[in-house]
Design a protein with these regions (language model features):
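Amphipathic alpha-helical polymerization modules
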Residues: 1-126
Length: 126
């Protein structure tokens, strides 16, 4: 693959991986108040051919769930407690911001490679 093609492929796989990461962060934020919900985390791994990255398996954060005291809640046990989620909104917002910035960086790289390819085609056309 040409250097420009490799650049486009790397940037595209980076954007796809960050979009996937942002989707999981969004799910975590949406379920922050869901009783018994465990935060989802993903990791990144390099593609075998070295042309980009992909997201690894989704894992559940096994950190202890928050115990909430609300005797009137339908899920409360005999002591009046139930399990909340282990989602920390500050962490999720920070992860979302990082994923957004990484996506934007890959988008700029993709756009630069596209512009370089277009310039090359314009030169060759003359």
């Amino acid at each position: 693959m040409s250097d420009l093609g490799t650049s486009l492929s790397l940037a595209a796989s980076g954007m796809q991986a960050q979009a996937n990461r942002l989707r999981h962060v969004s799910e975590n934020i949406a379920n922050a108040d869901t009783p018994g919900y465990h935060r989802k985390t993903i990791s990144f791994q390099e593609l075998a051919d070295g042309t980009g990255v992909e997201t690894g398996p989704v894992r559940l954060d096994r950190k202890a769930l928050t115990r909430i005291y609300d005797p009137g809640h339908p899920l409360a046990d005999e002591t009046g407690h139930y399990d909340g989620s282990n989602v920390d909104l500050v962490t999720e917002v920070a992860d979302a911001r990082e994923a957004q910035r990484s996506y934007e960086a890959n988008l700029r790289m993709f756009d630069q490679a596209r512009q370089m390819a277009q310039s090359l085609f314009d030169i060759l056309r003359k």
